[in-house]
């Protein structure tokens, strides 16, 4: 492949690790550091980025294509001078999807079996037998957002034996999953969900969507898993729902802000499990392989599956 991949992801100090990752999976690919003083943009350059600084935008506009190491690109499109005419591809690949599915399955099973109670009992040295008779095949899991990751997660849950439904903006069909679409159908979707999983993209339309009113459409005592974005959720409303029994428990991998301040009330709710945005971060080797494959597709004039629709924001 004659194209060159210029790496800015994770900063200057991370480049050697990235170089080794590319060497392991695609030793013939030309890779250089964004921070190399000798680097000057060439017509065949592609950028691998995460959170570029404002001063990077001028050079990004000279790229032939851009690959983001995150599944979300809202932080990029928030830059008013981000080059919207350059192909922008979100992170994907088998490892990214599998990691997300594994995390969600862990979270859903934990909510199903009341694992938070076991952890609290262990901390207190108390032998508390909270027997659970619910099983996966009688538990209804609903996934909000059926994009690349959401669809994969929904089907993974279905294969585990859960009764799975999904909700998205537009009509779709998905094997093993009952699909609802449109805002008019959202309350009906929620009414048949025991554990709600959020994997929506971050857009102005979805930010703050998950509030007390939305959660109130769920059956009393439902569970909630957020692996989308922290700002999808009105966090005070989430705490209210946990405190009054609207929700029996929740697992959050994303919050706002990140890192979560030490004095946040979220840390101290006994029905809430928080993880530090670790649900799905593929190895550098897997991300490098994905970037090489994306660049090869763009060089052939093909359209990658996760090419960003800038107008939609994902």
Regions found by a protein language model. Give the residues of each.
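N-terminal glycine-/charge-rich "phosphate-binding" loop or analogous flexible N-terminal tail
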Residues: 1-45
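Short acidic low-complexity segments
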Residues: 31-43, 54-57, 177-193
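Phosphate/diphosphate ligand-binding glycine-rich loop within oxidoreductases
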Residues: 45-119
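Short, well-ordered coil/turn residues at beta-beta hairpins
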Residues: 50, 69, 199-202, 227, ...
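C-terminal helix-to-coil terminal segments
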Residues: 87-103, 117, 258-314
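Glycine-rich NAD(P)-binding loop of Rossmann-like domains
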Residues: 118-152, 179
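NAD(P)-binding Rossmann-fold cofactor-contacting core
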Residues: 160-176
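Rossmann-like adenosine-cofactor binding region
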Residues: 171-265
